[in-house]
Amino acid sequence: VACATFFVFSDYMKPAFRLSALMQMPVKYIWTHDAFRVGEDGPTHQPIEHEAQLRLLEKMQNHAGKMSMLALRPADAAETSVAWKMAMENTETPTALVLSRQNINDLPAVTDRYTEALKAEKGAYIVQKNGENPKVILIASGSEVATLIDAAKLLLERKGIASQVVSAISEGLFRQQPTAYQEEVIP
């Protein structure tokens, strides 16, 4: 079972997706227009608090004592492919795919972008590292990750500040990783 609408309208669906989380129903929720940058539709169509509310369900345990919902907000086309893969493999809980409607640049890749995006299966991973000892860690999900790539470049060029950009597609999955991995990604 799957359903889709604008992310801002997920509020109307909250009782349904909360119950599907508690009942371990593997529903796929697809929400688009994920950011406040969708300004042409006016303030009624700008999701501000919705992602934070959704992330709380990742922290809520279902009756099996597991994360009750998998919430994924991919940063580019490669992460979206990985997110779909994760959604199809998740047969125990609902999955939320929170997608952008904006034209977003694909994130830079050292090797193959899809192979690098597979690291998203751990919830968060280092997308870009400027310098050996970053002074700043920039963390985002979804469409804001590309913005942080640009910000990291400016920090290095204009201020000489080395940074590390992290794509955090799922806070819940990231928190389940070993402490050593979490500290590697976010020292």
Stretches found by the model and what they are:
Residues 1-8, 27-30, 140:
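A short, small-residue-rich loop immediately preceding and capping a beta-strand
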